[in-house]
Curated annotation (Swiss-Prot):
One of its GO terms (biological process) is NAD biosynthetic process via the salvage pathway. InterPro entries: N/Namide_PRibTrfase, NAPRTase_N, Nic_PRibTrfase, Nic_PRibTrfase-Fam, Nicotinate_pribotase-like_C. The gene is pncB. This is Nicotinate phosphoribosyltransferase. NCBIfam families: NAPRTase (TIGR01514), PRK05321.1 (NF003704). The lineage of its organism: Bacteria, Pseudomonadati, Pseudomonadota, Gammaproteobacteria, Pseudomonadales.
Length: 407
């Protein structure tokens, strides 16, 4: 088989996405089937993606050819919390380009989604994977799988040199790298290596297609969009996080119990994360801000509620690599269970190659603005500054200045 990092088709199937898109999609089907949403793509570092417009459009059109095979549906059917009516819906589901607008605006690539949440929700991950791989095909056409493979083995060597055997036995790592992967073939290759040779515990992948293909566990619960949408779906803004968690609990009855804390801020989240939720959810996910300070805050919260932190799990997923994961693991070992979801550093780390820095985020729900503030100054995402100000006011979040970038 060719050692080229690229294949003809970028997105392999409807399952070539993050698992949490499917878990949220089922909850949307059952609770909000007619809600409209809007999303916008943003390249964070100003890279010129205009030359790739036509090819990106072509790849988006190819998405419409995808449907779930009986084998795909049989795989999902084995997951206990995937309901029969959702499986029937997925069997009929097709991507529809009427909900996608891809243009050049102000000399930048612009991708906007607008349509029913139920029909738009699956676009995010494949669209980002398409932009990344199209760009990489043009910029780095001669890249070989061996370059990515050798880089990963170098990381394994570093880990076995710096971690003890006991530490490695407890270090749990998962792949969260679909959306910014260098290419599909690189992610597939990396997962095979991780499954067979990772010196710690490799616990699975967020990619459902590759989980099925490589007999791995598909991982994921909810994303920021779930909590953001409830800013316009709940009865009052102040109750939006509670509404999001309540709806999740009704849908999954204690399963899929890792909650994301930083949609507004972790402090604002923990104010709503009372004894009921703290007992019911298995743990929390970190996605911005200082990871150890965040963990200390979570441990303290559990202790105040009379819950043993060792009965809970913290999942870390913010720009991780193996050295960072090992540092966090050591800081928290024996105090609370930890697991690490590593993305770009596994699926797009090739010597001499700069990975994409991009996002595709929900900007409106039910015709009104939604926002993510996060625990990191400068990571706020919203088109409407007035709504952000209102959100900060309601949740008593101070407006911190963004850190200045060096000249």
């Amino acid at each position: 088989m060719s050692e080229s990092a690229f294949s003809n088709r970028i997105v392999q199937s409807l399952l070539d996405t993050d698992f949490y898109k499917l878990t949220m999609m089922q909850a949307v089907l059952h609770n909000y089937p007619n809600v409209d949403v809007e999303w916008e793509f943003r390249c964070r570092n100003g890279e010129d993606l205009r030359p790739y417009l036509d090819e990106i459009k072509h790849q988006i059109e190819l998405l419409c050819e995808l449907s779930l095979s009986p084998e795909h549906l049989a795989f999902l059917e084995r997951i206990t919390f995937i309901k029969p009516d959702f499986l029937r819906f997925l069997g009929l589901f097709r991507f529809n380009t009427r909900y996608v607008k891809t243009t050049i605006e102000n000399d930048e690539l612009c991708i906007r989604l607008h349509g029913p949440w139920l029909h738009v929700i699956l676009f995010e991950v494949p669209l980002l994977a398409i932009v990344s791989e199209v760009r990489n095909r043009h910029r780095y056409p001669d890249t070989l799988l061996s370059q990515a493979r050798d880089r990963l083995y170098d990381k394994f060597e570093w880990l076995t040199t710096h971690a003890t055997t006991d530490e490695l036995a407890e270090l749990k790592v998962a792949d969260f790298g679909t959306r910014r992967r260098f290419s599909y073939r690189v992610q597939e290759e990396m997962l095979g290596v991780l499954k067979n040779d990772f010196p710690g515990q490799f616990v699975g992948t967020s990619n459902v297609h590759l989980a099925r293909q490589l007999d791995l566990k598909p991982l994921g619960t909810m994303a920021h969009e779930w909590i953001m949408a409830h800013q316009q779906l709940g009865p009052r803004l102040i109750d939006s996080q509670i509404a999001a968690l309540d709806c999740w609990v009704r849908e999954y009855r204690g399963l899929l119990g890792i909650a994301l804390t930083d949609c507004i801020t972790t402090d604002a989240f923990l104010n709503d994360f009372d004894l009921y939720f703290a007992k019911l959810f298995d743990g929390l996910r970190h996605d911005s801000g200082d990871p150890v300070k965040w963990a200390e805050k979570c441990i303290s919260h559990y202790q105040k509620l009379g819950i043993d932190p060792m009965s809970k799990t913290l999942v870390f997923s913010d720009g991780l690599n193996l050295p960072k994961a090992l540092d966090i693991f050591r800081a928290l070992r024996g105090r609370i269970n930890v697991s690490f979801g590593i993305g770009t550093n596994l699926t797009a780390d090739i010597p001499g190659i700069a990975p994409m820095n991009m996002v595709l985020k929900m900007t409106a729900c039910a015709g009104q603005a939604v926002a993510k503030i996060s625990d990191e100054p400068g990571k706020t995402q919203c088109k409407d500054p007035n709504f952000v100000a209102y959100l900060r006011h309601v949740f008593k979040v101070p407006d911190l200045p963004s850190p200045e970038k060096p000249a």
